[in-house]
């Protein structure tokens, strides 16, 4: 199929008015004055805008269902602060209406998983937002291991297993050390009892899976960096609310930041520095940054609004769009498939009446894998 005369934001080059082709679920050609093959369908998008499908790098979409209480809340397993053996895919209901609303908002790929009650909460996975079977929608499982620092684990286990930040770090270090020992015993051929929790942590130690680290306060962000360097593991700095005051340390670490959710009330002390200025400051410093809704904290369909507010607060407009397309794809290591319009990549794209950051924009169509989903 050939689409012509659109203003195309490929996120691989400057926007231009041109054409693109899709076939068998992928982009095949992007350029100007493309000609249709015999019998090929052609759509004229004159006056319209095309963007890659939006990518959400941190959420709980489908795990905390809408208009329901505990029955549909499968975000946190608050029975033990160390639960790396939990799998986000087992708690995700893709038929909840929030998934469809995200799709209508142009969000085509999300990374979803457990919340931040536990020091180690379980695995995140990535899925496309069209379908009714999560196994068929999933494109990478697992994609990260959730970890959490600061107020949330302290609050959830206060007076029981955690009272201080020291204990949070100690529990994480203990699990990492036990996993390294577990690996050594297995690889040396020694008899070792199967341990589901340590098995889940093996990809983290082998740097096959990053720790997805919930950290708002500056000292917690620096603790993440400290432990990551100690154990030579990959991490992402999720939320990164205080990141503006430790920009140089974050830049030196080389770890990416997932900023947000920045819309709404500052409901706890950790959020006192919450601001839409943060993504722009980090981006200008050369740090790879994406913007998150942390849905359902902010409904997923407002991901583009969050990017617009970041642009309003000083982030370059094009960089703000990158922060909800190619940047999260890079952070999730899915940029070989999604996040930009490029030959060979999944044909996930949205057709808009205006720039995606314009609050008056209307999304006319959403395509996933070359098929019209909205």
List the predicted regions and their residue ranges:
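C-terminal cap of metal-dependent C-N hydrolases
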Residues: 6-10, 18, 330, 342-374
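Histidine-rich, glycine-flanked metal-binding segment
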Residues: 8-53
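Metal-associated gating/positioning segment near the N- to mid-region
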Residues: 48-114
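Active-site gating loops and adjacent loop-to-helix segments of metal-dependent hydrolytic enzymes
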Residues: 65-92, 133, 147-153, 203-205, ...
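His/Asp/Glu-enriched, well-ordered alpha-helical/loop segment
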Residues: 66-67, 73-77, 83, 210, ...
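Divalent metal-dependent hydrolysis catalytic cores, especially in the metallo-beta-lactamase
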Residues: 81-87, 95-130, 138-152, 208-211, ...
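Active-site core of metal-dependent hydrolases
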Residues: 88, 183-275, 290, 330-332, ...
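Metal-coordinating catalytic core of metallo-dependent amide/deamination hydrolases
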Residues: 126-226, 230, 268, 296
């Amino acid at each position: 199929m050939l689409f012509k005369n659109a203003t195309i934001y490929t996120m691989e080059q400057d926007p231009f008015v041109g054409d693109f082709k899709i076939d068998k679920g992928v982009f095949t050609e992007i350029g100007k004055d493309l000609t249709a093959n015999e019998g090929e369908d052609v759509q004229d998008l004159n006056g319209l805008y095309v963007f890659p499908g939006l990518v959400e790098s941190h959420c709980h979409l489908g795990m905390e269902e809408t208009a329901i209480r505990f029955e549909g809340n499968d975000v946190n397993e608050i029975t033990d602060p160390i639960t790396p053996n939990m799998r986000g895919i087992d708690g995700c209901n893709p038929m909840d209406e929030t998934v469809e609303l995200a799709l209508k908002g142009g969000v085509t790929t999300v990374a979803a998983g457990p919340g931040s009650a536990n020091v180690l909460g379980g695995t995140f996975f990535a899925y496309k937002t069209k379908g009714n079977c999560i196994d068929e929608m999933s494109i990478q499982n697992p994609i990260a291991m959730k970890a959490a620092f600061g107020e949330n684990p302290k609050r959830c286990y206060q007076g029981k297993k955690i009272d201080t930040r020291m204990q949070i770090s100690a529990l994480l270090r203990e699990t990492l050390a036990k996993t390294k020992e577990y690996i050594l015993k297995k690889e040396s051929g020694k008899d070792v009892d199967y341990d589901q929790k340590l098995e889940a942590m093996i990809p983290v130690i082998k740097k096959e899976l990053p720790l997805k680290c919930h950290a708002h306060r500056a000292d917690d962000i620096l603790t993440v960096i400290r432990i990551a360097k100690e154990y030579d593991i990959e991490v992402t700095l999720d939320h990164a609310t205080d990141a503006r005051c430790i920009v140089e340390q974050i830049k030196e670490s080389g770890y990416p930041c997932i900023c947000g959710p920045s819309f709404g009330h500052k409901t706890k002390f950790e959020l006192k520095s919450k601001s839409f200025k943060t993504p722009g400051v980090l981006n200008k410093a050369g740090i790879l940054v994406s913007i998150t809704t942390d849905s359902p904290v902010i409904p997923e369909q407002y991901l583009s609004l969050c990017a617009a507010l970041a642009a309003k607060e000083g982030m370059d407009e094009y960089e703000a769009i990158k922060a909800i397309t190619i940047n999260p794809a890079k952070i999730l290591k899915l940029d070989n498939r999604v996040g930009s319009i490029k030959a060979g990549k999944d044909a996930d794209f949205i057709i808009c009446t205006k720039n995606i950051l314009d609050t008056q924009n209307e999304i006319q169509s959403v395509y996933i894998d070359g098929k019209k989903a909205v």
